[in-house]
Amino acid sequence: MTIKDFDTKKVILEDQYKSDKYETMTLYFIAPKEWLEGLYPDAVHTEISVEYPLNCPEAYAATVMVSPTRNLGEDGYEDYDWSDLEMSLSDIEALIGMAKS
């Protein structure tokens, strides 16, 4: 999947998860549901994850994925149907930079 008109100003850093076991850092971002291009009408927003090795926090080493998020009411929210997201290195660098600032 690709996102047309990607804009970091429309993205919010939601969480960071460091895995000592796998030696990775995963960043989670909330983005507009419109970026899913209507594929998931029940989505409340788009979730983007960026995962990279702890010893190489660089865009070229990152894996980027995207998922719709749905509201489960009292049970909270659920990210589902994860898929690979193709992004430019500069956009990935911008997302990693958001977590560093």
Model-derived features: positions:
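Extreme N-terminal leader/activation tails
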Residues: 1-19
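Acidic, low-complexity, intrinsically disordered interaction modules
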Residues: 19-91
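Short intrinsically disordered terminal tails
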Residues: 1-4, 74, 97-101
